[in-house]
Amino acid sequence: MQTDFDVIVVGAGPSGTAAAFRLKRFGYQVLLLDKQQFPRVKPCGGGISIKALNLMPWSVAPVIERAVKKLGMGVSSRATERYEVFEAQGYVCTFAVREAFDNFNFGKAVEAGVEFEHSSELSEIDERGDFVRATLGNRTITARYLIGADGANSTVRRLLSAGRWFYRGFAMEGLVSYADVGAEPLAAFFFGKVANGYGWLFPKGDHINVGLYTWDNTVTLSKEQLRAYSIDRIESDKLERIIGFPIGFGGRNYVQNRERIILVGDAAGFAEPLLGEGIHNALKSGQAAASAIIAFDDGRSSSLRLAYKKELGPIHNDLVRCENLKSFFYGNLAGIGYGALRFPVSKIALMRGFAAGKTMYELTNTFFLSPLFRPAQPPALYAHCER
């Protein structure tokens, strides 16, 4: 059947733009849908790991506001609080405002020829043999494939009645102007500030992103908790734009229940639960979905399900490892969990791994090779925003 497009991508965040851009490069006609116009406000801590930067098909240096070689890591318990500075020779993390980061990537996809449509009216998805039909308001559009990249509260996942594997974690953030604090703090994680999670301080260009995270959906985060954490860490309760948001987990058990419809990123639960990072696996799964479609069309796989499962192999391995580490680390936080983290050999390996852009699966499998790891990002690229 002749369809309107080759691929419809629902959601224009990191996973959606990654998929759309790769498909367009291979000659596919792609429609990118999003319920919001760009630029749009997107709640997120805005930490962009080196492993995520390594996946980008273009430099995002213009929207990076801080690049750091040091991270503060602390742990709080009823009995005590401990804190140390972890340092590497190369950048271990960068920070951006998600509104700017997403808009930059969206612009690159549109520049490449991806067609965009603003629509919040997706109400039905129907797979019919060799094509997919999507209903938008009072009209329908067709494509050979559809990719759901619409986040933790995915409409695509809901319409498919999919996601028994899926669960949500939560985060809450607020912004504090540098004018309201004495000095710019070190980028830092404070584990144990909330149950089964941590508090963060992420410095940006003119403000600090202050936040709380938990992978445990039985834990409630509140504005009062966030203000108390901000007062405790930077002696300021002047938080602006406080907002909570879900994070999609459970993707280690992702099941594709349609042949021509794929979920990616948080819609598939591909955020890793150890630290709650979602951008790396969003990019990687978006690219994986595109590669799976291309492989299936080229006859290199007998089904799209098998092609996507193969492409997801590295993500699956890392999610399993992060789930196991999550259980060990947070379950023994005040004792051996944080103790293992700050053990000199672990400390060095961790920071070298971060700087080299290693996943947790790669890092733990090559732990004793960490002296051979080299920083992945050129120093000159982010010298303008190094702190």
Regions found by a protein language model. Give the residues of each.
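Beta1/beta-strand and adjacent pyrophosphate-binding region of the FAD-binding site
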Residues: 1-13
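A conserved beta-strand/loop capping segment in the N-terminal third of enzymes
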Residues: 49-104
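FAD/FMN-dependent oxidoreductases across multiple families
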Residues: 124, 217-293
